[in-house]
Amino acid sequence: MKGSKQEAKEKQVERDEEAETKEEEEEVNTLHAESKTEKGDKDWEEEEEEEETEVVTEQGEKKTVQSSVLSAAKMANTSSYDPVKDATWKPGQPVPYMFVAKTFEKIEAISGRLEIIRLLTNMFRSIIALAPQDLLPALYLTINRIAPSYEGLELGIGESILLKAVADATGRNLQAVKADYKAQGDLGSVAQSSRSTQRTMFPAPPLTVRKVFDTLYKIAKSEGRASIERKKGLIQNLLVACKDCEATYIIRSLQGKLRIGLAEKSVQVALAHALVLTPPDGQCPPAVLDASKTMSDAKLQQQLIQATETLKAVYSEMPNYDVLLPVLLKERDISAWPTHCHLTPSVPVHPMLAQPTRGVQEVLKRFQDSTFACEFKYDGERAQIHYLEGGKVHVYSRNLEDNTQKYPDIAQNLPKSIKAGTVSFILDCEVVAFDRKTMKILPFQVLSTRARKTVKLEDITVPVCLYAFDLLYLNGESLLRHPFQERRQLLHESFQEAPGLFQFARYLDTSDVEDIAAFLNEAIASNCEGLMVKTLLKDATYEPSRRSYNWLKVKKDYLDDGTTDSLDLVPIGAFYGKGKRTGVYGAYLLACYDDEGEEYQNICKIGTGFSDAMLEDLAKSFKDKIIPQPKSYYRYSEQVCPDVWFEPTTVWEVKAADLSLSPHYRAAIGLVSESKGISLRFPRFIRIREDKTPEMATTGTQVAEMYKSQGLNHAT
């Protein structure tokens, strides 16, 4: 009897799942049908990337730049801002934190990227003109960091500590503060309103940028048994001195999220513009205050573009503002910046990434005029290995996290593969779980079971093998500008394989379609994801932090069902579960990230790929990420409005059957259709991407390219 009841229950669950699937199919089929009628039986033979514009340099050379860079330069060119008269402090005085906080407040109130860049540019210009020594802390406060990301020094203070600090600093009851926080969903706003009603007998001196930054740094560095009370005391000291909107942004900085829709790319553009418009000079004559008065419009525009592109380039090789800013403030010659700021061991760079393709034919079409190599695409964790003279080893993740303590076995085994004469290097490779008895690669899921923090050699249960595929630096010389064929040759000349510990990525240099197909099958049989295809000589330099069409990936899923590449998406909301999913979220609203507009665009509703246990765990994990209303930088349709909204905090890898145009979703809107976005058909959850931040999610531009590529693939 008990068995029959269990069988009946299982059958009911099965019927519920079938009903949910049918309902989902009907919904997406309707959306897909709508996309067919879109003025969209358009020929996608021509690739459509971000619009570019041709400009003429000072030397008379023609150069292509992104239209967004040109637009920002044009707006900066028309600014009437006076960095001294419009500042709120005098030369020689420290920068008031209020000046920065008020800029944040203005940015939060608008959404236009160019206007945001203009506001930031003006803020930086005043700091450069009046207090250049405060530019570094002001910059760190703006990007909400206190040190280079690879140093792992972060804020993100616990909610309970912040609540108590706000209550103690404002003299309010803790329960009242909690109630306000629950109602408003923004502890920064609660802190500000609490301070505005507080009366003090002896007002604290005004906060400065340096004071706030130094205090945040002390809080982040505070460790030990008494650290909680010490942190709380430091926070209270800041809050007691706050005026106007300062408390809002100090609390948000402590939470680790400014939440004003500001991306680091915009900060870099603003900084570049400020350095051109108000060059650092140590004095304030009119020419220094406003470079536009001594240059023609055309020349100024060229310098703004040059500074923007050069700053982005040097930061991609030296992502450390402590090193960069002194150079930028001292070196007036923009073209000289790269000579001072370049690839250096112990400073990791964001890796070069590949564009997805839908099959071998697309690869051949894109690389028809180039020689190229096919490599096994290993299913592991991307790693950048830095080896310093003297033998010190650093292991960094693709997100620039220092994973050296996670992989002590790599540091121990690597010297066995280093040939004589190799004294320093930076390797790009994949860490893969490996069975040394069978000498076979293990699935990524096995690797993910390894402990993430301080690991002892004797406690390791999942051995790993390092598969090296690129060499970025060797014996004091950067190889970034060398073609891939030369870098690969140096890699093989400088290292030797140690089976099961250190191996070279399997590769094949060919342009024969049958050879590529056979090699792809061989990769899949070896438990790999598919192939990486890379140009060998033409356009074959290594480009840090860029997803390039000179690297393409072909994954095994294409052989199974012709589906699209996976996407990395951010859950921004959820829908209450029904039936067997009562008590947990039944589905989630996912978004891609538009790095130009600095917004999250909804792309699909997902409820497939989760186990019951996972749904329960997710519901618990999102409990403290619920917000009362969507962010100003969430772009969505009222037709797909979730029951609850979340902070953008995590990234999920998702697969889908296809992509289609939809009036209910906003992903890539304006890139394929002016009125419709792109949605995923039959999305399913694959895994959580712990190595990615929300800003590293799939972009709207990438979604549009995947949609067009799918049309191209169907046509071939």
What are these regions (language model features)?
Residues 1-512, 589-591, 595-609, 634-639, ...:
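N-terminal nucleic-acid-engaging modules of covalent nucleotidyltransferase systems
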Residues 491, 550, 559-560, 658-696, ...:
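C-terminal catalytic or substrate-handling cores of phosphate/nucleotide-
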Residues 386-388, 543-547, 565, 580-586, ...:
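Short glycine/proline-enriched turns and hinge-like loops at secondary-structure junctions
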Residues 352-374, 378, 513-519, 535-578:
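Flexible, glycine/threonine-enriched loop-and-boundary segments that flank and lead into catalytic domains
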Residues 495-543:
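Metal-assisted phosphate- and nucleotidyl-transfer catalytic regions
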Residues 622-681:
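C-terminal structured "cap/appendage" subdomains that terminate the fold
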Residues 395, 579-585, 598-605, 612-617, ...:
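Extended hydrophobic-aromatic, low-complexity segments
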Residues 380, 463, 528, 549, ...:
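Active-site lining segments that contact anionic ligands and/or coordinate catalytic metals
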